[in-house]
């Protein structure tokens, strides 16, 4: 069968949908309900995931330089990597205010989180407005570029398996703004496989598989059979 065309940039862009799901569909209901314990656990998961994603944008010393630097490299500084690094510093401060509010009670936590959500969602839009038109102009093939500049940085954080599991679980449960859970999961996982080496994919495949519901995973593999290894003939 002919598999759908892979969208390599989805390994980065679709994670914005994961973060939006976290903010709007997971964390906001918990904050509004005053369920501090459940919020604390979900917030801890979110913080690890967004830290890996930010590293894939900003780069990690000794590993990939990040997506913003990649776009600056190919388009004469047009992405503004330094500007986005500065935004990430500010984002981290607003994020820390939420963590600091956890022991202060439900009302303080909700207020801090809503301020953070507004900042974070505006930041995601700003990145998309600047970066996506540039991504569309990158030379092909793009998979080696994203592997070198972004994925290597994510792996260097030591939390890339969390990034994969968190992303797949979110998309499998909530989908994305423009796609069903099945479609959103497929697009992200297909991109992830494409930017991984075979050895890396052998490591991350079981993580992705276990993070999706069985029905979602079956639907994804039905469309992209190459995600799963072909059993050896006996």
Spans of model-derived segments:
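Small-residue-biased structural context
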Residues: 1-234
């Amino acid at each position: 069968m002919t598999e759908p065309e892979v969208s390599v940039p989805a390994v980065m862009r679709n994670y914005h949908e994961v973060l939006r799901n976290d903010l709007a569909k997971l964390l906001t209901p918990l904050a509004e309900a005053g369920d501090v314990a459940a919020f604390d656990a979900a917030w801890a998961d979110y913080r690890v995931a967004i830290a890996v994603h930010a590293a894939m944008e900003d780069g990690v010393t000794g590993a990939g330089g990040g997506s913003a630097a990649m776009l600056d490299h190919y388009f004469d500084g047009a992405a503004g990597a330094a500007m986005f690094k500065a935004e990430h510093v500010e984002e981290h401060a607003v994020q820390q205010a939420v963590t600091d509010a956890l022991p202060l009670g439900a009302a303080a936590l909700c207020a801090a989180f809503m301020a953070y959500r507004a900042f974070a969602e505006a930041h995601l839009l700003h990145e998309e407005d600047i970066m996506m038109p540039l991504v569309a102009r990158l030379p092909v093939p793009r998979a080696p570029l994203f592997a070198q500049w972004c994925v290597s940085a994510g792996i260097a954080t030591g939390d890339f398996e969390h990034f994969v599991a968190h992303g797949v679980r979110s998309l499998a449960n909530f989908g994305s703004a423009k796609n069903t859970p099945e479609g959103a999961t497929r697009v992200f996982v297909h991109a992830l496989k494409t930017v991984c080496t075979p050895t890396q994919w052998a490591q991350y495949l079981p993580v992705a598989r276990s993070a999706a519901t069985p029905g979602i995973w079956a639907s994804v593999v039905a469309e992209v059979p190459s995600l799963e290894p072909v059993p050896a003939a006996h």
